[in-house]
Amino acid sequence: MEKVYEELDEVKAVNEKLRIDYRNKTELLENLKKVQNEQLIEIREARLVNEKHGFEIEEKSREIAELKRANEELQRCLREKDSVVKRVNDVNDKLRANGEDKYREFEEEKRNMMSGLDEASEKNIDLEQKNNVYRAEIEGLKGLLAVAETKRIEAEKTVKGMKEMRGRDDVVVKMEEEKSQVEEKLKWKKEQFKHLEEAYEKLKNLFKDSKKEWEEEKSKLLDEIYSLQTKLDSVTRISEDLQKKLQMCNGALTQEETRRKHLEIQVSEFKAKYEDAFAECQDARTQLDDLAGKRDWEVAELRQTLSMKDAYFKEMKYENGKLEQENRELLGSLKELQEATIQGSGNSALSKLKNKFRNLENIHKNCSANLRSKEAEWSSQVEKMVEEINDYKLQLQSKEAALKEVELELENCRSSTAKMRLQYEEISIMFLVLSRTVSEAQSRLANAKDKQIKDEKREGNCYSLLMEQLDQKNAALAKAQMEIKEERESVACLLKRIEMLDLFENQNIQMQKEVERFKEMVEESSRFQTQMQEKMKEAENDYEEKLLQVCDALDNTNIDLVAEREKVVSLTRQIESLGTVKEKNLVMEKETQEYKEMLEESEKCRVLLEEQISQLESDSNENIRELCSKVDIAYAKLAEEVEKTASLVRKSESIDLNEEHRQRELDHYKEMLEESTKTQLLLQEKVVDVENDSKRKLADVSEALEIANSELSDKTSEVFQIEFQLWVWKSIAKRLKAELEQNQNLRKRVEASLLEQVGVGEAIKQEKNELVHKLKVISHARSSDSEKKESLMRDKDEMLESLQREVELLEQDSLRRELEDVVLAHMIGERELQNEREICALQQKDQDLCEVKHELEGSLKSVSLLLQQKQNEVNMLRKTWEKLTARQILTAVETESKKMMIIELEGEISSLSQKLETSNESVSCFRQEATKSRAELETKQTELKEVTTQMQEKLRTSEAEKTELVKEVASLSTEKRNLLSFISEMEDGMLKLYDGDTKLMKTLERVTQCCDGFGKENNNGETIGSPRLAMKHEEDVVTEDRSPFRPLNH
């Protein structure tokens, strides 16, 4: 007993130790719970950090909205600049008004010059009056000469009288002397008169020459004035255009400078944002490093705890072994005691030990049941954990793929940022070059303006010189030499002026070339700016999308971390419940190993995340570069789109034509349907008429049969002939039945073939739909793959898809119509074949009846009356056959003996009634078919209405699209026209300048020719002088020649 008590004490001591171990394990579990709580706190802090990142992203989105607002403000600034441009246009209008005032002043000067020309013409009129006076004087001299001649005649008469009266020689001598003197005077006066006439003719010729020269000079001067005015107008217009262009260039340069400044600001903002994002990434990396360090520390603590648990587990195993051995020893000792001491004083102690033993057995039994239940629970939990682990592995793989994509995008973003920096540097260089070129252009324009002012002053001086020249020419019509000198001076001035104008035109041409070059530079810069804006927008969108993706990835990782930590919490709880169970310890070991692997994988994922972030930065740069290249490709595609718009316009026109053709076809089909409905109505009316006629004819046939029965009772000798006729009719009926069966078989075959064709058509439609679906799937896949590349082509792809759908619908409609046409054609063909066959059968019957008639007429003359009656009956039946359209078979007239003929006729009447029933059934079938056809027609009409409405809607949409395309084409055509008008204006200006140059050259050639002519005349002795000097010279010559008459004049 003492040994049992000692053993019990030892068991108690072992139990106390186990309790102490349990307490220690509970403390360790509480520590693990605290660690888990700390981890949860860290996770919450990480969530807060993520929320902060989300707020920062929202702030960035707000900043983007502010940038958009800034963009709108820039657009407002552009509008204000447009208003400024309008004001500048108003100023230009004012300048034009000033130019018009100057033009009016020039017109006033022109009028003054014309008044000077009028004064010169008045002087010419005075000279003409003087010439008339000289002519009157010459006529007076001629009268004096006539008077002198009369006096001479009278003197001669007196001399003759004196001679007659006086015969003195002295008087005769005197008279002769006087006569000789008078004759000499007369000769001298005649010579003088001749000289005067010659001088007068010379003066006339000189006056005419001077008048012609004056008119020529006047016309030349007027031409020069007009040419100079046109040149001035063209020069003023060119100068105004250049000023406008310069103002536009200055405005564009200011706009470009403002844009450049805004772009620099945006670049700086983007740099700051990039630096902030980079700093945030670095912070995230540091946080990840801190988290990794904490995880390493936690893993080390977990490993320590696991090692401690392993040691405790081994101790527990050892203690359990000891306890089992002790239990066995106790059981053996108890059995010995039960055998040894059945009776004695140890009964009470044995009863106590038995009770304790029983309690221990119950406890062991309960422990085994609990262990089995827990083993089942843990096996199910292990399976669930394995499934969850597989799921988490798949999630980790998907996240790794997503992280790789994010890394690629970051690399693209980095490459694109590098490209953007290079492009911004190129833009800055371009702006510097443009600023320098603009400054040079402004300096050149200032010099050109100074030259223009000088040229205007010179032109004013030239106008004053021209006025002086006109005054001098008007005052010096009698002084040709002075005019020649002045003309030479004017020629020299004109030559100088022409040289200056040539220089001015060359300068203008150079300035135009420079302006065009500046225009091209401005256009290129504007295009480049638009490209850069689009690229910046696309880069912003990509950056936002990538940030969203990164945020989503971070959220997913945080969720995964939370799930993992929750799993850790559940595992710690499970560890609490798995205190002393071996299987639970094994499961814990497996789970710890798995979690070690998970931690290692998480560390790998963290490393991969860091690598992916670096790759994403590089991908972002590459994406920006690719976007730049894509934008260039898009601008290249814009030209193709313009061509495509033209082709679409052409296609729209062709579609309009096709739609008109289809509308016509629809109208034609509608007419066909109306005609078919009308034909069906007519057929129904005919069927009703046929029924009525058949009833009437049946009544007539019954009456005729009664008459035939009454008449055939007396005539039995004709039975065999009538039996022959009946046999013929039976053969004909069999033939008709065979033909009907053939027709029905043919109809069934045709219907089967039509159904097969319909099935084939539906299969083709299904295949087409499947192909269309596949094409749509492929197009969607391609569009999803190339959304970034072909964002501009989506609208046109949708247009093409809608056009394809319309084409498919039209094809389906055409197939339906073709099938309907085929069905109608088959039905009509069947009816026509049936009609033809019935007609042929009736014709054959007619022929057979005619043959029978001839045979009966040849063989039986006595029965002619009956045959005639039966022929009439046969004719009536033939008419009924023609009207029933191959659905009714008439029976022939049967004649037998009285009883046999009556029986056969009753059988024929029954057969006729059955056939009438069949005909009624066929009529009812026809009616049903007619109703079905009506229903089908109504459905088809509804379908046609729906199709027409759809086509009208499509036509409306196509018309709207057509109007939009026409508007776009009109806008493009207007732009083209504006460009062509601008080019034509430039060409007109150049042509005007060229015409002015040619006119000036012509005037110079004329002036030089005139100068050469005047020089030659002066070199030839200055024969063309003033008329007065010539007269004086001639008078001196005459006086010198007539020197002997000087003493006689005294």
UniProtKB/Swiss-Prot annotation:
Keyword Endoplasmic reticulum listed: no
Keywords: Coiled coil
Superkingdom of the source species: Eukaryota
Residue stretches in coiled coil: 1-420, 463-627, 692-981
InterPro entries associated with the record: At4g38062-like (IPR040262)
Transmembrane portions of the chain: none
Name assigned to this protein: Uncharacterized protein At4g38062
Lineage: Eukaryota, Viridiplantae, Streptophyta, Embryophyta, Tracheophyta
